[in-house]
Amino acid sequence: MPLSSVSAAQWRALSMRAAEPNGYYLPEWELAVNASARGRLDAAALGAWRDASTLIGLLPVISMWRAYKIPLPALVSADPYGTLCTPLLDRDMAEEAVTGILQQAPGAHSRRAPPSRTAIICPNGNWR
């Protein structure tokens, strides 16, 4: 799903409940990056919801090809400035959030990447 289509109110609420806060993934910051950072425009969002009104996990991503011109079937952080790419996970539903995010990964990859081989890569190594 396009990052810009995530409800800012749900996103903000998730950032307040996050198991590990991440300033690079606050809605105001990441939406500004999404609108203006060269090579990071129109990012995708891997998200997980408990129900239609409760976002429990969010990871803004782009393809590795768009980010680094490396032709691998991988997704990387949509934030070009930060070294922290820990996803926002609801502290009370982290397992469900991770499961939901990973289930979305094959559908969010580049059209050239086989769905079963899509990877999510975090440069600082704290989530794979």
Question: Over which residues does each language-model region extend?
Answer:
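N-acyltransferase acceptor-side catalytic subdomain
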Residues: M1-R128
